[in-house]
């Protein structure tokens, strides 16, 4: 019975297998390199058969694929087995959800930097990333039925970081960070796209109310009385005119130039115009500054209007536009 392989040796073999089957697949190799590749493939296959129990799943795949199984994501090299890489930093676990079932603020492919990576495993992995109002999810592709990882954006911030790479994507990198929490680092396809992701993340940490969380005034909140009066104070020009029709008095009003004894008793009812006033409606009296108006009724005083007569014409008069003619 063959001794069990140490875990780090199994990891190395898996990385080497992935490197040969995936990374070298698209390379143009010399005849000597191809021969060496075939030797390595044979030796790896022999080792896996010698430890069939430990590599049972991989062995089954070898038989089906004539050698080595191709990874589901060409950029994600031997990453799916590393469960620790995908676990949330705080130990929280979030319900599995399909990528297509999420309502998101932004979604798209990014390159995610691995927390730990080996010599053969790629440092950057292609991931379908989804930012919601409060969560960040990442998947192998936009068709995945469950996320590879997720974390709450509560407390997190985002910023550009041009020190993560030294290649053409140097200015396309950004990171999501928070005090005492894991830092997540990504690379977009362009600096503009990276900045858009940063802005979306910065605005998705619960600071923006959703459509169902619009801000409304509290109907139970007590309103300061003085403030309420300021809001609803009626100005003369905005005062509501009475809707009740005015009945023309049967008695003839005392004319202005009347010198009879009645004038001496009606001084209090004589007013003069403070400003020019043009009636907007037929039942409103028009007058100019200084015109004499005889007030017939103050029935609509609460509305800011009186009933007056001038030169035989009767109509509504805004009381704020007239003043007493005599100081009695």
Curated annotation (Swiss-Prot):
Disordered as annotated region, ranges: 231-262
Family matches, as SMART domains: PH (SM00233), SH3 (SM00326)
Domain annotation PH: ranges: 103-206
Regions of compositional bias (Basic and acidic residues) in chain numbering: 238-248
Domain SH3: 266-327
Record-annotated membrane-spanning stretches: none
One biological process term in Gene Ontology: B cell activation
The entry's keywords: B-cell activation, Cytoplasm, Phosphoprotein, SH3 domain
Pfam families: PH, SH3_1
CDD domains, alphabetized: PH_Skap-hom_Skap2, SH3_SKAP2
Family, as annotated: Belongs to the SKAP family.
Protein name, entry field: Src kinase-associated phosphoprotein 2
Organism per entry: Xenopus tropicalis
């Amino acid at each position: 019975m063959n001794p069990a392989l140490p875990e780090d040796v199994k990891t190395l073999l898996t990385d080497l297998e992935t490197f040969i089957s995936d990374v070298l697949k698209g390379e143009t190799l010399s005849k000597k390199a191809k021969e060496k590749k075939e030797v390595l493939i044979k030796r790896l296959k022999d080792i896996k058969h010698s430890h069939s129990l430990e590599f049972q799943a991989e062995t089954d795949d070898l038989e089906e694929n004539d050698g080595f199984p191709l990874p589901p994501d060409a950029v994600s090299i031997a990453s799916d087995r590393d469960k620790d890489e995908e676990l949330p930093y705080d130990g929280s676990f979030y319900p599995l959800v399909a990528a297509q079932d999420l309502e998101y603020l932004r979604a798209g492919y990014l390159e995610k930097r691995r927390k730990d990576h080996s010599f053969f495993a790629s440092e950057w992995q292609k991931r379908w990333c989804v930012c919601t109002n409060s969560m960040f999810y990442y998947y192998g592709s936009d068709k995945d039925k469950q996320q590879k990882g997720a974390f709450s954006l509560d407390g997190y911030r985002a910023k550009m970081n041009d020190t993560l790479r030294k290649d053409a994507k140097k200015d396309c990198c950004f990171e999501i960070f928070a005090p005492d929490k894991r830092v997540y680092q990504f690379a977009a396809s362009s600096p503009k796209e990276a900045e858009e992701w940063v802005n979306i993340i910065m605005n998705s940490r619960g600071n923006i109310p959703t459509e169902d969380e619009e801000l409304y005034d509290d109907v139970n909140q007590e309103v300061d009385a003085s403030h309420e009066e300021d809001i609803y104070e009626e100005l003369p020009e905005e005062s509501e005119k009475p809707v009740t029709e005015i009945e023309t008095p049967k008695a003839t009003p005392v004319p202005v130039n009347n010198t009879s004894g009645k004038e001496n008793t009606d001084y209090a009812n004589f007013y003069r115009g403070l400003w020019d006033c043009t009636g907007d409606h037929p039942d409103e009296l028009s007058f100019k500054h200084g015109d004499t108006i005889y007030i017939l009724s103050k029935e609509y005083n609460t509305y800011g209007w009186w009933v007056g007569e001038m030169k035989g014409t009767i109509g509504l008069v805004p009381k704020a536009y007239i003043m007493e003619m005599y100081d009695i």
